[in-house]
């Protein structure tokens, strides 16, 4: 798996973006061909897909957690399926206590706090485990562009700061798929940000299925200390903005690629940087699950999703998705 930081030309077009455009056209053709030839697997439960149309963090993991909490509160049997990015997974497996992020992925370990999680390598291997678990609902994390899995209900997550970047497909831009195509087909659209004031023009045609969401801290952290922040997630800027909005004294930060597997040398460097600033290391939950043996030395900022229209979510999920009917 290639791990990249979000380059500036993905947000604002420059000569590099235009030079890469021919490769983007090839990517578009291959994606179309793949979708045209695929025969989707239909699972024996309602499948709710949470995804995005661009590379990088858009808050979809927090949406998955929100849905998991919602279904659990309604006593609806559910299973979460994740792709196990950044792991050494060899076969599709149910995540158990004792699994590590390196074995089943950081997102899988994080999501396993909220329900049963299947770390999937191939779609075709999911069915036997679903037949064994017999859920009423399956939440699939980031399978939106996978044509081999049938979806009953789709939720698209959009980051309100980045939106759709420079509007080019990978690798010239951040897009996996044409935004209009994705948004037209979506059942719900989450506009996610730590600080949002208005709806972007691109999303106004979808106001009837748009939910504004904010990512807010959910744990108490001492605001009288200095912190050195680091992360290896798709959108580190949102993490740093959340820290600032929480009014923590951040004296420095370091960015790693998404789903980064930290080395001992990385930790030693981070400790050195924190010591220079008389600070404590602070990171995201997705990064924190990789440091279980260092729980007393690294602070984790837990966050949760706060949405403006829970009634719309309940109506769409429990009526259109035919849950509890």
Curated annotation (Swiss-Prot):
Transfers the gamma-phosphate of ATP to the 4'-position of a tetraacyldisaccharide 1-phosphate intermediate (termed DS-1-P) to form tetraacyldisaccharide 1,4'-bis-phosphate (lipid IVA). It catalyses: a lipid A disaccharide + ATP = a lipid IVA + ADP + H(+). InterPro entries: LpxK, P-loop_NTPase. Belongs to the LpxK family. It comes from Rickettsia prowazekii (strain Madrid E). It holds the Pfam family LpxK. It is an enzyme of class 2 (transferase). GO terms for biological process: lipid A biosynthetic process; lipopolysaccharide core region biosynthetic process. Its EC number is 2.7.1.130. The gene is lpxK. NCBIfam families: lpxK. This is Tetraacyldisaccharide 4'-kinase. ATP binds at residues 54-61. Transmembrane segments: none annotated. Pathway: Glycolipid biosynthesis; lipid IV(A) biosynthesis; lipid IV(A) from (3R)-3-hydroxytetradecanoyl-[acyl-carrier-protein] and UDP-N-acetyl-alpha-D-glucosamine: step 6/6.
């Amino acid at each position: 798996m290639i791990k990249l930081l979000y380059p500036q030309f993905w947000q604002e077009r420059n000569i590099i973006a235009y030079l890469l455009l021919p490769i983007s056209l090839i990517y578009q053709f291959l994606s179309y061909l793949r979708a045209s030839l695929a025969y989707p697997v239909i699972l024996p439960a309602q499948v709710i897909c949470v995804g995005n149309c661009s590379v990088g963090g858009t808050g979809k993991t927090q949406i998955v957690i929100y849905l998991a909490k919602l279904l659990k509160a309604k006593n609806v049997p559910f299973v979460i399926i994740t792709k196990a990015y950044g792991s050494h997974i060899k076969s599709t497996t149910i995540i158990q206590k004792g699994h590590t992020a390196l074995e089943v992925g950081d997102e899988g370990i994080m999501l396993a706090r909220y329900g049963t999680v299947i770390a999937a390598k191939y779609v075709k291997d999911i069915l036997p485990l679903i037949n064994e678990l017999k859920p009423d609902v399956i939440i699939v994390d980031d399978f939106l562009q996978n044509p081999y899995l049938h979806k009953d209900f789709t939720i698209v997550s959009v980051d309100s700061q980045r939106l759709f970047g420079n509007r080019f497909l990978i690798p010239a831009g951040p897009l996996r798929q044409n935004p209009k195509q994705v948004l037209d087909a979506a059942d719900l659209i989450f506009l996610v940000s730590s600080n949002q004031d208005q709806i972007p023009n691109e999303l106004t045609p979808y106001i009837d299925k748009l939910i504004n969401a904010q990512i807010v801290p959910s744990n108490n952290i001492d605001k009288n200390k200095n912190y050195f922040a680091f992360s290896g997630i798709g959108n580190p800027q949102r993490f740093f903005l959340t820290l600032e909005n929480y009014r923590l004294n951040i004296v420095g930060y370091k960015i790693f690629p998404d789903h980064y597997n930290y080395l001992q040398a990385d930790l030693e460097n981070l400790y050195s940087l924190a010591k220079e600033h008389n600070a404590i290391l602070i990171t995201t939950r997705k990064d924190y699950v990789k440091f279980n043996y260092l729980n007393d030395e690294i602070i984790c900022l837990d966050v949760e999703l706060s949405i403006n229209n829970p009634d719309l979510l309940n109506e769409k999920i429990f009526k259109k998705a035919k849950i509890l009917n």
